[in-house]
């Protein structure tokens, strides 16, 4: 018994060290991937930033030369105010002055981006009251949204993922793991087609300044809740049916986010991925381990109690024998 307990303890110790080692490699790999992304982005984007800075300096110098009555300080003050307004989603350009950022449809689009944590950043609250309400609204709304999405995804996953896999497994006798992998791949392909490629083609037509790559980039940035805000639909000059367009985009973002979560949940339920994820988790104490601990404690306690009981039995057995001998000795002389 003690050898089996010691052996199981050694196995648990080895598994815990292996999990810690795998977790260390995971942290190191993530940091290296983070550094790799920084190196690539810096090497690709830094030359374009430098060219843009040079172009702006030349444009500013040429403008001051053509307008000698305007000082550089006045120009910088004007540009600073324009950029500040632009950060709040207000543009001074004549072709963009007709679009309001806080009509009902735009506010509905903003609320959806806040609750989904996408947050494009092109429109932000201007007043202190709006900022305070945004904090309170988000504190309540984001957990509410997570609860809503979790419930919806769970119900959809049952009908879209689990039942089809079980049907093919039971009805046709296919391997459950193989069916799950094929189903996950097909579901991912359908989702990418319906929520990335087709909407990207639609956006490239509806948005004048967007090509297909930029439209696909917007779809990915939006449905992955990154929301950089460099591309926002419905902000063009004289956008036709802008209110209806904004409502359609809001519905697309909500449905697309649900579809993405369903696909992720489907892939996470794959046996291979579950096994891979467990490599980095802390091993839970199994019931049998707790039983072994209890049995070990009971073994130690019972051995002590057994020894004590044995000593008491010996005392009980010896006491009558001694008493009988003593009484016999006393009766002997009396009889004599």
Curated annotation (Swiss-Prot):
Homodimer; disulfide-linked. Heterodimer with KCNK2; disulfide-linked. In astrocytes, forms mostly heterodimeric potassium channels with KCNK2, with only a minor proportion of functional channels containing homodimeric KCNK1. Interacts with KCNK3 and KCNK9, forming functional heterodimeric channels. Interacts with GNG4. Identified in a complex with PSD and ARF6; interacts only with PSD that is bound to ARF6. Interacts with UBE2I. It is a multi-pass membrane protein. Sumoylation is controversial. Sumoylated by UBE2I. Not sumoylated when expressed in xenopus oocytes or mammalian cells. Sumoylation inactivates the channel, but does not interfere with expression at the cell membrane. Sumoylation of a single subunit is sufficient to silence the dimeric channel. Sumoylation of KCNK1 is sufficient to silence heterodimeric channels formed by KCNK1 and KCNK3 or KCNK9. Desumoylated by SENP1; this activates the channel. Desumoylated by SENP1; this strongly increases halothane-mediated activation of heterodimeric channels formed with KCNK9. The modification Phosphoserine is found at residue 326. It catalyses: K(+)(in) = K(+)(out); NH4(+)(in) = NH4(+)(out); Na(+)(in) = Na(+)(out); Rb(+)(in) = Rb(+)(out). GO terms for cellular component: apical plasma membrane; dendrite; membrane; perikaryon; plasma membrane; potassium channel complex; recycling endosome; synaptic membrane. Ion channel that contributes to passive transmembrane potassium transport and to the regulation of the resting membrane potential in brain astrocytes, but also in kidney and in other tissues. Forms dimeric channels through which potassium ions pass in accordance with their electrochemical gradient. The channel is selective for K(+) ions at physiological potassium concentrations and at neutral pH, but becomes permeable to Na(+) at subphysiological K(+) levels, and upon acidification of the extracellular medium. The keyword Ion transport applies. Residues 104-116, 117-122, 212-224, 225-231 dip into the membrane without crossing it. Residues 42-103, 123-132, 203-211, 232-243 are extracellular. This is Potassium channel subfamily K member 1. Residues 117-122 are annotated as: Selectivity filter 1. The record marks 118 as: Important for increased permeability to Na(+) when K(+) levels are subphysiological. The keyword Cell membrane applies. Belongs to the two pore domain potassium channel (TC 1.A.1.8) family. Residues 225-230 are annotated as: Selectivity filter 2. Keywords: Cell membrane, Cell projection, Cytoplasmic vesicle, Disulfide bond, Endosome, Glycoprotein, Ion channel, Ion transport, Isopeptide bond, Membrane, Phosphoprotein, Potassium, Potassium channel, Potassium transport, Synapse, Transmembrane, Transmembrane helix, Transport, Ubl conjugation. The chain crosses the membrane at residues 21-41, 133-156, 182-202, 244-267. One of its GO terms (molecular function) is outward rectifier potassium channel activity.
């Amino acid at each position: 018994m003690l050898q089996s307990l010691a052996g199981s303890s050694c196995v648990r110790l080895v598994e815990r060290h292996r999990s810690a080692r795998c977790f260390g490699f995971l942290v190191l790999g993530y940091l290296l991937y983070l550094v790799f992304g920084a190196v690539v982005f810096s090497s690709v984007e830094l030359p374009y930033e430098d060219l843009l800075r040079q172009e702006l300096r030349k444009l500013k110098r040429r403008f001051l030369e053509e307008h000698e009555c305007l000082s550089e300080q006045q120009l910088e003050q004007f540009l600073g105010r324009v950029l500040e307004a632009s950060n709040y989603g207000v543009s001074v350009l004549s072709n963009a002055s007709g679009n309001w950022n806080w009509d009902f449809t735009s506010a509905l689009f903003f609320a959806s981006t806040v609750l989904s944590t996408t947050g494009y950043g092109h429109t932000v609250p201007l007043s202190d009251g709006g900022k305070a309400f945004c904090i309170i609204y988000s504190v309540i709304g984001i957990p509410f949204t997570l609860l809503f999405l979790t419930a919806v995804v769970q119900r959809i996953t049952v009908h879209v993922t689990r039942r089809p896999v079980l049907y093919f497994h039971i009805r046709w006798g296919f391997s459950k793991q193989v069916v799950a992998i094929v189903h996950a791949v097909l579901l991912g392909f359908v989702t990418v087609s319906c929520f990335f490629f087709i909407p990207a083609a639609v956006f490239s037509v509806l948005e004048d300044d967007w090509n297909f790559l930029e439209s696909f980039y917007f779809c990915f940035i939006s449905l992955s809740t990154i929301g950089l805000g460099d591309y926002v639909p419905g902000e063009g000059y004289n956008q036709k049916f802008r209110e209806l367009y904004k409502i359609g985009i809001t519905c697309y973002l909500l449905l697309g986010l649900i579809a993405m979560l369903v696909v992720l949940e489907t892939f996470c339920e794959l046996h291979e991925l579950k096994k891979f994820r467990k490599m980095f988790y802390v091993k839970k104490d199994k019931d049998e381990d707790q039983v072994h601990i209890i049995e070990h404690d009971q073994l130690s306690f019972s051995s002590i109690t057994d020894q004590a009981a044995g000593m008491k039995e010996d005392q009980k057995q010896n006491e009558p024998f001694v008493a009988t001998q003593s009484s016999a000795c006393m009766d002997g002389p009396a009889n004599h």
